[in-house]
Amino acid sequence: MRKESFDEIKPWENNILLWVKQRKTISETIDAQREAFRDALNSIVIQKGWTVWIDEAKYLSQMLGLKEELTYCVEQLRSIDSTVICGAQRPAFLPPSVLAGSTHVFLWKTTDRRDQEKLSDIGGIDASIVRNEAKSLGKHEFIYIKSRGTTSHTTISQTPK
């Protein structure tokens, strides 16, 4: 097995970070973000073969009003050799297919009832176990769930106390 450190990994040349500059008002900024992200997602669907990282899927879905586009990407992009990775601080406000259609899910501690209820959208697992474990996680612990394939797996990280 080859070991690599961060200073040995070569930079990738084909990365794109979409960052919309602040406008005069919040409303103008949100409008500009909505247009830029909608155009980017449409281009990704046409071009195929992308890996898309959406850092705050709740913001994209709710604030920018792109729930339909996010749902489409999560449900359809794998059929065109593309991957969607969604990050979110609050699972309660994600479209249902974001969790239900995920192959890999990483969860950190949550005690919010709405977030815990949303975890039942993860396919192929016992939601009550995940909800209970998610409440009791320590500061640096997380739950990893592989929800696709012939069987589902749930792993809880262990950190030294």
Where are these regions (language model features)?
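Walker A/P-loop NTP-binding active-site region of P-loop NTPases
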Residues: 1-11
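Conserved P-loop NTPase mechanochemical-coupling segment
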Residues: 9-32
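Flexible, charged surface loops at secondary-structure boundaries
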Residues: 9-14, 43-48, 136-138
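Hydrophobic beta-strand segments of well-ordered beta-sheets in folded domains
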Residues: 14-17, 50-52, 142
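A broadly conserved detector of short glycine/acidic/proline-rich loop/turn motifs that flank catalytic sites
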Residues: 22, 111-112, 148-149
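Conserved P-loop NTPase motor cores
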Residues: 30-127
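P-loop NTPase motor core of the ASCE superfamily
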Residues: 72-74, 104-106, 116-161
